[in-house]
Curated annotation (Swiss-Prot):
GO terms for cellular component: extracellular region; fungal biofilm matrix. One of its GO terms (biological process) is (1->6)-beta-D-glucan biosynthetic process. It comes from Candida glabrata (strain ATCC 2001 / BCRC 20586 / JCM 3761 / NBRC 0622 / NRRL Y-65 / CBS 138). Keywords: Cell wall, Cell wall biogenesis/degradation, Glycoprotein, Secreted, Signal. This is Cell wall synthesis protein KRE9. It is found in: Secreted, Cell wall. Belongs to the KRE9/KNH1 family. It comes from the Eukaryota. Pfam families: Kre9_KNH1_C. InterPro entries: Kre9/Knh1, Kre9/Knh1_C.
């Protein structure tokens, strides 16, 4: 019954800002045929602006850390709502085609830019995907960087005389308890930069415990749709150990012949004369 209520509430959402559902994390797309096609799908997430206000979309192929987004393919073709497919469940879809010569193989994500005339824009990102059999140039960072979560959405929308700017500043949300966040997509708490000394003498709970709320009637919207788990926001330093290796036990007097510890002498047994 609870599952049914959740499903019904999802379909009862008002038409609103972008919530990407495809591609999924780690999905692989091949450019062996000269073109790689990424199927993009998104639904309404209950936040402003309504999707019927979106004038056009722009799609870009990007890579790199969440704090250093680099878009390597940014076609300026404006995709209008008439260019999109929409099924009966309210899922929008678009096939984003990219020539395999644009970039080399590696880990990428797609940036979805939605423009609302006279009000502003929103930015959303797909989970990280893998492009294989690509024939374009590559970089060391593209080949080596990996992560599990996409960049967080950004919103800059003017409603009336106010500007509604919801840009996820990682440095600010890391310290905000999960239960105090109010956006549709929340950020899970992560480890902070450790100090150089341990000063605590007792333990204490850093964040409140979680809870679940059951509803007796169907809701027309959801308080939250997704949770992001950011990458580390701290660094771990390392150095080369230049200390001279210790001598082997046989060289520093710590080794001894085990025969000196024997209290009984050994003798050879002939197994042919052993009885069971």
């Amino acid at each position: 019954m609870l599952l049914l209520a959740i499903l019904l509430s999802l379909f009862a959402l008002i038409r609103a800002d972008v919530n990407i559902v495809e591609p999924g994390p780690g999905d692989t797309f091949s450019g062996a045929d000269g073109t790689v096609s990424i199927n993009l799908k998104w639904v309404d997430n209950g936040a402003y602006p309504p999707l019927d206000k979106v004038a056009y979309y722009l799609f870009s192929l990007c890579y790199g850390p969440n704090t250093k987004i680099q878009c390597v393919y940014k076609p300026d073709t404006k995709i209008t709502p008439d260019d999109l497919d929409k099924d009966d469940a309210g899922t929008y879809s678009y096939k984003f085609d990219i020539q395999s010569s644009v970039v080399g193989s590696g880990q990428f994500y797609v940036q979805v830019f939605a423009w609302v005339d006279g009000q502003g824009y929103t930015l959303h990102y797909t989970p990280r995907i893998e492009l294989t059999n690509m024939g374009g140039p590559t970089t060391f960072e593209l080949l080596t960087y990996t992560d599990t979560i996409q960049p967080v959405p950004q919103t800059s929308i003017r409603t009336g005389t106010d500007t509604n700017t919801q840009s996820f500043d990682a440095s600010s949300v890391y310290s905000l308890p999960y239960t105090e966040q109010t956006l549709k997509t929340r950020v899970a708490p992560i480890q902070q930069q450790p100090g150089t000394k341990v000063t605590a003498t007792t333990w204490s709970r850093r964040y409140p415990t979680s809870a679940v709320t059951f509803y007796s009637t169907f809701r027309s919207s959801l308080d939250q749709l997704s949770t992001l788990t950011p990458a580390w926001n701290y660094t771990v330093s390392s150095a080369v150990n230049y200390a001279t290796p210790a001598a082997m036990p046989s060289d520093n007097g710590g080794w001894y012949n085990p025969i000196k510890r024997q209290s009984l002498s050994t003798r050879k047994l002939n197994v042919r004369y052993l009885s069971s």
